[in-house]
């Protein structure tokens, strides 16, 4: 790699760019150059290690970060896959979801859509939204999904009145989503994990 690439980086950043064997973690505050390091690392892999850009996957949490990485990497002439965790999982599920009985044209429900489904599930179960906040129910289901706890597993762990209500609502919520050929944001991650585990 020409030195002009590295001159913009401090010694620690240069080490991160040049290390290609084994895992590496970059911990730093906002605005400290993490995205720059990743961008330069991609260019190093492509230009110096002859890595095919199609074999590089960059994943981040936010659309803003993904778009920033895409812009920087493309300015440097590369085109690896850059995505958020959710968009990557959605793409995988649209292609391979058939193995877990998902149609490729599933809808992705945002928070408001999900709250509407929670309210519908509560209505079907005759559980009052005055007694239990739909947003709290949704937050509990979201937490369960982030821990990879399915609706059937949640029932086994439910303790106390609130969790027992969530345990009743969770499967009805999932059933409504399924009937609508929809996934919520947490399902994108959860279903992808299940897909990989089962196949």
PLM-predicted stretches and their roles:
Residues 2-8, 34, 40:
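Conserved RecA-like helicase ATPase core segment
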Residues 3-4, 21-23, 43-199:
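A basic/glycine-biased coupling hinge at the interface between accessory DNA-binding modules
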Residues 7-18:
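Pre-Walker A adenine-sensing motif
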Residues 10, 39, 186:
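Glycine-rich phosphate-binding loop at the start of an alpha helix
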Residues 16, 28-30, 58, 65-66:
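Small-residue (primarily alanine) positions within well-ordered alpha-helices
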Residues 21-40:
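Walker A/P-loop
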């Amino acid at each position: 790699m020409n030195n002009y690439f590295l001159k913009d980086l401090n010694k620690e950043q240069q080490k991160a760019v040049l290390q290609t064997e084994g895992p590496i973690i970059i911990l730093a505050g906002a605005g400290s150059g993490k995205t720059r390091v990743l961008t330069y690392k991609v260019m190093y892999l492509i230009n110096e290690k002859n890595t095919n850009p199609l074999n590089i996957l960059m994943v981040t949490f936010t659309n803003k970060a993904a778009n920033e990485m895409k812009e920087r990497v493309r300015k440097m002439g590369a085109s690896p896959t850059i995505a958020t965790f959710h968009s990557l999982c959605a793409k995988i599920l649209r292609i391979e979801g058939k193995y877990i009985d998902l149609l490729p044209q599933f809808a992705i429900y945002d928070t408001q859509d999900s709250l509407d489904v929670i309210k519908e599930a509560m209505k079907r179960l005759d559980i009052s939204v005055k007694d239990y906040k739909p947003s709290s129910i949704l937050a509990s289901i979201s937490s369960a999904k982030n821990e990879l706890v399915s609706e059937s597993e949640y029932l086994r762990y439910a303790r106390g009145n609130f969790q027992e209500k969530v345990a009743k609502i969770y499967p009805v919520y999932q059933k409504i989503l399924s009937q609508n050929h929809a996934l919520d944001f947490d399902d994108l991650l959860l279903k992808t994990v299940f897909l990989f585990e089962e196949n």
